[in-house]
Amino acid sequence: MYKQTVVIFLLCFFICVSCYEVPPAKLEAIWPKGLRVSLPDDGYSLFAFHGKLNEEMEGLEAGHWSRDITKSKGGRWTFNDKQAKLKIGDKIYFWTYVIKEGLGYRQDNGEWTVTGYVDEAGNPVAPTSQPDAVVTEPPAAITPATAIVTNPPTSQNTYPCEISVSMVSVPGFVCKGQLLFEDNFNKGIDKGNIWTTENMFPGEPDYPFNVYLYDNVHVRDGKLIITPTTLESKYGEDYVRQQLDLTQRCTGTIGTADCTRVASGPIILPPVITSKINTKNRFSFKYGRVEVRARMPTGDWLIPEILLEPRDRIYGIHSYASGLLRVACVKGNVEYSKTLYGGPILCDSEPYRNVNLKQKIGFDHWNKDFHNYTLEWRPDGISLFVDGEKYGDVTPPTDGFYGDAKKENVQAASQWLKGTSMAPLDDYFYISIGLDVGGVHEFPDSSTKPWQNKATKAMLNFWNNRDQWFPTWFKDTSSLQVDYVRVYAL
């Protein structure tokens, strides 16, 4: 079957006249024999049906029926099996798949029971006997007499699955355990399709010492790879003292420091190039389980960013007022690389910045190999796992995060009272993956750090000390490498 590198799976949508919907498949038992499965044409380029009769599907197996339909007819995408011999009480287990505007949408765990028949035109019929091919009796609860007068259901009164508390950024409902998002990075990143590649200067609140460009992210051997390089390696020696204008392709706010920087005196251009990608424009969700298999980078002052970021920032746009969720982070310095941490950040600075983060000390350096990092985000808390082992829980107090934050003079705390006890972590978030360098909050000041966080010359001092940190960066080990990203409904 046609395979997409990136798929967003959403199923069983409500009818909504003002918004996009993916309709449920319509199944019909044809008298005296036949099965018809159809969807209304909504701009699809492919419709696939996979099903089994009276036997549950094993995951995404092909099934007894396995067919790709590449053309619609009469305004519908239709699969027909004119030889199928169905009886009242038969149950069909199925899943369907459509491609619309280059994106794949799958309807999982479908179940449909034969309660009546229609003719080829779709008109209900009331046969006086079961089809000739029926060789087994109907279930005890359904007799031929009652089956004859049973009308096909005219509306869907129950959900076809147990509903999840997870929500996605399109109308509809989500089933428990449903795979909502997956990218195995088997193909290159299509800019603007699922992932948006940042092209901008990152700024507050952490002010990292890098610029995000398209150049430093690519896919190789089924892995997403984000590599740090110096600005001089692209633009020439001493370019940190020049001007860099990204306006033409900038993904930040045009006319601001997001898109244009001019060096002046001790204020230099960010001396390192990295990359960052996100799903903000295509996929966001509320509550779920995020799984990322990744290898963290090795090298001084490197910070891998595997995050969930707030889509609408309804509680404020500054100082992480609307929250940030770290799926996992291992800093690149040798002295830090045995420490894994993850969880929520609700303030840009201490003492409240890291209070809710959970840590796990490894027997070895986490960046020596790939690991599975998981964050489970629920309406009542957060759990963190590595390679299937839980290493931390974050549960809001009875008054939410507000009480503790207020004690630490977090300005945004009062805004959280507008939400649930999980506020500000109770709205839609999107996935972002990137690599940062240095900055003014991630590393505490020390005698071995070449800059002071509050110093005006912080970035310049970092750059002037490059003979110390740059030799710790290697092409094969200083990149953030991601094998896959998956999001499941709770």
Curated annotation (Swiss-Prot):
Pfam families: CBM39 (PF15886), Glyco_hydro_16 (PF00722). GO terms for biological process: carbohydrate metabolic process; innate immune response. InterPro entries: BGBP_N, BGBP_N_sf, ConA-like_dom_sf, GH16, GH16_GRP_C, Glycosyl_Hydrlase_16. GO terms for molecular function: carbohydrate binding; hydrolase activity, hydrolyzing O-glycosyl compounds. Monomer. Belongs to the insect beta-1,3-glucan binding protein family. This is Beta-1,3-glucan-binding protein 1. The lineage of its organism: Eukaryota, Metazoa, Ecdysozoa, Arthropoda, Hexapoda. The gene is bgrp1.
